[in-house]
Amino acid sequence: MKSLLLLPFLLLLANCSTSPVPVLPPPPGETEPLMEAAAPPPAYSGGMQQIINVSAYDPKAPLRHGRGYSENDVSALRANGASGLIARAGKGGNLDTKCASFLTAADRSGLLPGVYYRVQRHVDPVAQADQFVSRVQSLARSRSWQAPALLLCGDYDGDLPLASILRFMDRVQSRTGVIPVAYLENSPQLKLQTRAADAATKARLRQAPYWLALYSHESGAGPIFPAPGTPEGLVDQYHLWSHWTLWQYGGADWERGASRPKVYNAGRYRFRPFFGNLDRVVERNVFRGSPAALAAFWQQHGLRLR
């Protein structure tokens, strides 16, 4: 899952809320490489459920004082209000080395576990789907799970043809009975394809819940499409789904030799640069719905574990 160019920010980002909140200047020392950690947010900040996604690149290096986590202990994520964790299973034919450890730790901490696979153009999508499903089935058999289901997601590169996305979806569904969630970048190539797709292709793609990526209200401006501005604006540009289901609003960018927060903060969506009192950047998402809706969604688009 790609990061975008980090925007300068001079203000301390306000806590997650569905309505505007005051933005205060940073306290003394806030711009130092190691800053003091903020207090943990409420479990369901802004009424939206918080989901963390991870890969072998995580955890990233600490940037301030606070709580850390590892692939073997994600209790700090749960303590700071996360409801679920989605780990990368593989990418373009290669399996992720930390996936199993992250999922075991997530289940032990009471987080809903999920997996995603980064689908790339240079490898046959059916072969990637087979690798994904085989890995998922192996994980499902690997332990006695507390969670009822393992969420399945496809992370589709921005240069993929829609036919490849459909082939991946079809193969995963044929082998598991589950339609994987569709993670799409803020990609002009994909937007042009979805807008021009025939009715049958659009209907099939709509069966996959939309997981969007938008880290800034200024991201995505180009010669074809303006910056979408909001998650709803990005939904409109794809001209396919009626709404988003998951939104990746926070990630990391590489700046001056370190990972720095890249977090959406505009209009009625105000998120802090760090997740609660964590000492480092994490990839952050929100689910559009209640805790009960999240549980139902996880089971509908997940492989049963018990």
Q: Language-model segments: which ranges?
A:
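Catalytic domains of cell-wall/extracellular-matrix polysaccharide-remodeling enzymes
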Residues: P148-D236
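Polar/charged alpha-helical tracts
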Residues: S75, A79, S134, S138, ...
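Functionally critical loop-and-helix segments that line ligand-binding/catalytic clefts
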Residues: P20-A61, L205-R206, Y210-R306
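Substrate-binding cleft of extracellular glycoside hydrolase catalytic domains
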Residues: G29-V178
